[in-house]
Regions:
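Active-site-proximal specificity loops/subdomain of glycosyltransferases
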Residues: 21-24, 33-70, 105-106
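A conserved catalytic-core signature of glycosyltransferases
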Residues: 114-122, 133-134, 140-141
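Conserved donor-nucleotide/metal-binding helix-loop-beta segment in metal-dependent transferases, i.e.
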Residues: 83-107
Length: 227
């Protein structure tokens, strides 16, 4: 039997310790006998609106540095727990949307082009398409923006319609002004998908904080601060 593959989970994060504990426990159970899990927790410092896309980009760069550019990765919200049948480590396309059956949406997609929740890919593919735009602050729009870039790139994309996730309850902070700015940026991206900045660590400092490796799971934490 060959060595188990490495899988990197990239978690955009702030003030969700209880969810992170549940997620880590589930991934440890889910991975047994199938793959070696590496969880990259990209924690945004307090002070600025949350930037999920930028945090995921920063995590991609860390996986690329530590595990290599062809490592399977999951761009993964911390509040989504996978069913045992979810497959993270075998990718039939450059981008595979996994969160198609999520409990909070009654196991349906909330809209036709939904590309949120959990996406499996590799650092190489993310860097090739330019990653998420770096300019989506606050809630909403960055997943749709990534899908625009994937479609424009010519790389392959698939959806798996039998991958189930349980979503954990949480409060979402929505800033109406930022939401409208994000919608305006998304409309500009429909004309030019590369508006809004490509994957980069420019404008951020990223510092590794106390992490954990115990032979079964690797959990690496990084404090990400806008500059």
């Amino acid at each position: 039997m060959g060595a188990k593959p490495e899988v990197g989970f990239i978690i955009p994060f702030r003030n969700r310790e209880a969810h992170l504990a549940q997620f880590t426990k589930r991934i440890l159970e889910h991975s047994r006998g199938k793959y070696n899990p590496w969880i990259f927790v990209m924690e945004q410092a307090e002070g600025e609106p949350f930037n999920r896309g930028a945090l995921l980009n920063l995590g991609v760069l860390q996986v690329n540095r530590i595990l290599g550019d062809n490592t399977p990765i999951a761009l993964h919200d911390v509040d989504m727990l996978p069913a045992p049948s979810v497959n993270y480590h075998q990718l039939e396309a450059d981008f595979v949307h996994l969160a198609t059956c999520v409990s909070q949406f009654k196991n349906k997609m909330p809209y036709q082009d939904y590309f949120g929740g959990v996406v499996a890919t590799t650092p190489r593919s993310m860097i090739s398409v330019g990653g998420f735009p770096m300019d989506f602050w606050g809630w909403g729009g960055e997943d749709d923006a990534l899908l625009l870039r994937v479609k424009a790139s010519g790389l392959s994309m698939r959806r798996r319609y039998n991958q189930y996730f349980v979503s954990l309850a949480h409060e979402r902070e929505i800033d109406g002004d930022l939401l409208w700015k994000n919608r305006d940026l998304l409309e500009k991206m429909r004309r030019d998908p590369y508006t809004g900045g490509r994957i980069s660590n420019e404008g951020w400092t990223v510092d590794q904080t106390p992490s954990m490796r115990d032979g079964q799971i690797s959990l690496l934490r990084f404090l990400c601060t806008p500059t």
